[in-house]
Curated annotation (Swiss-Prot):
InterPro entries: Chaperone_TorD (IPR023069), DMSO/NO3_reduct_chaperone (IPR020945), HscB_C_sf (IPR036386), TorD-like_sf (IPR036411), TorD/DmsD_chaperones (IPR050289). This is Chaperone protein TorD. Involved in the biogenesis of TorA. Acts on TorA before the insertion of the molybdenum cofactor and, as a result, probably favors a conformation of the apoenzyme that is competent for acquiring the cofactor. It is found in: Cytoplasm. Its main location: cytoplasm. Keywords: Chaperone, Cytoplasm. The keyword Cytoplasm applies. The keyword Transmembrane helix does not apply. SUPFAM superfamilies: TorD-like. Belongs to the TorD/DmsD family. TorD subfamily. GO terms for biological process: protein complex oligomerization; protein folding.
Length: 215
């Protein structure tokens, strides 16, 4: 495995991790893992990237605060519901259609566009996650899979085409709405854990675009 393919694997893992955080409430077991040496080492290593340092440290700060709550898992689950599962007036709804389509309705053109990406690359949406295709967790899971598929390409031309597809996907399907999604999450997530997650997501996407564009 060369340095670039190893780096791609790390990128995929980060996107899958962020997808998992934004797909459902953390269980008690998952929350306990965030206090483990392995996870804290992962976060510390991520924070060593200067462009990510502030965002990662903000998340670590919120994780530390979570551990001090009396009913940590229940309260964080309530935060998840408040942040993402309310109405568009009270929550930061995690669907691209809510930000990119003038109708303001779910399953609009951005969801159709996402279904086309899934079909083009023969990547299946997880059957147990019954959400519109433009849910943030589905888009991030797709991106992780696209990165892994990139590493599987045999020719240099195919590899470069898949790297280019990643750049297009991030710009068109993610950075077109996640900054606003993060702003609303900051406004409506009073405790701030999920606002820290979406803040890190946007920061990482912007850094990843620079990497993919060769800047």
């Amino acid at each position: 495995m060369n340095e670039l393919t190893a780096f791609n694997e790390q990128r995929a893992e980060i996107y899958w991790w962020l997808s998992s955080l934004l797909s459902a409430e953390l269980t008690t077991e998952q929350l306990e893992q965030y206090g483990s040496f392995e996870v804290r080492t992962f976060l510390s290593n991520l924070a060593e990237t200067p462009e990510l340092s502030d965002s990662v440290n903000a998340l670590i700060e919120k994780l530390n605060a979570v551990q001090g709550r009396e009913d940590a898992q229940l309260e964080l689950s309530a935060d998840f519901c408040d942040a993402f599962l309310g109405s568009d007036k009270s929550s930061a709804l995690p669907y691209a259609s809510m930000y990119l389509d003038k109708s303001g309705l779910l399953n609009a053109k951005p969801a159709q566009d996402m279904r086309e990406w899934l079909t083009k690359y023969n990547i299946a949406q997880k059957a147990e996650f019954n959400e519109p295709a433009d849910h943030i967790a589905i888009e991030l899971d797709f991106l992780g899979n696209l990165i892994v598929m990139t590493n599987q390409q045999v020719s240099e031309d195919e590899f470069e085409a898949y790297m280019s597809a990643q750049l297009t996907f991030i710009n068109e399907q993610l950075l077109s709405w996640t900054p606003r999604f993060n702003e609303i999450c900051i406004e409506r997530d009073k405790f701030g854990f999920y606002a820290a997650v979406t803040g890190l997501l946007v920061t990482f996407l912007k850094l990843d675009v620079k990497f993919l564009a060769g800047e």
